[in-house]
Amino acid sequence: MEKVIELKDVWVRYGNQTILEGINLELKEPNGLLGIIGPNGGGKTTFLKVLLGLLKPYRGSVKLFGKPPEKSRELVGYVPRYKGFDFDFPISVWEVVLTGRMSHTGLLKNYREEDRKAAEDALKTVEMFEYRDRQIGQLSGGQRQRVFIARALATNPKLLLLDEPNSGLDPHMQDELYRLLDRLKHKMAIIMVTHDLSAVSVYVDKIACLNRKLHYHNSKEIPIEDLEATYQCPVELIAHGMPHRVLSNHEGNP
């Protein structure tokens, strides 16, 4: 079976500062949701950029679907944090989602019928097709996030990467977002980085902890030692609201 992701001893530096240290990760399943948790500044966004081929490690190897990331981009959808997005810019939902097809059409080429069909299917998947003519700035935060996910889905990805997709959403919108991802994970592999410990304990299939080093055991359970090492504080301060079954020690005992 072709591996979705294979990282071997990956190290990343900014200047003299090590951001990622000795990362090893292997995902074989073509579907499912992996949640990656960790503190601010722990390297989660950097990790996604490495998978996208936007950052090259100074040591180690990265492969997506058996190829280097730069040769696998058409197979990957990405939903970044849109901190600097100007929501007053006059662009419609439909136009936003169509831009997701640029990896197939090129920057200056016209959209084809297959591109429009892919955009339509993506909007229907996230239940936003009826809003296609709305300006993006007229939508709620949860609706915008669905549109950005549709933009990523328009590429027909085998792997979907999401960077803090629940950021800025109220609890109801977050719940809708997670239910959407719960449906999508049966069609593709998904990696989501987040601070929301309670959400990952409910919706993800597997969990990894990242704070420069990656702790991953191919399981939904998080060894208490890994959680404390990642957040550098006692588990009682960070695991409030997490189901007890999610936490384990390295011997597998509750």
How would you describe each model-predicted region?
Residues 52:
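Helix-to-loop junction immediately C-terminal to a conserved catalytic motif
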Residues 160-164:
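Catalytic Walker B motif of ABC-type/P-loop ATPase nucleotide-binding domains
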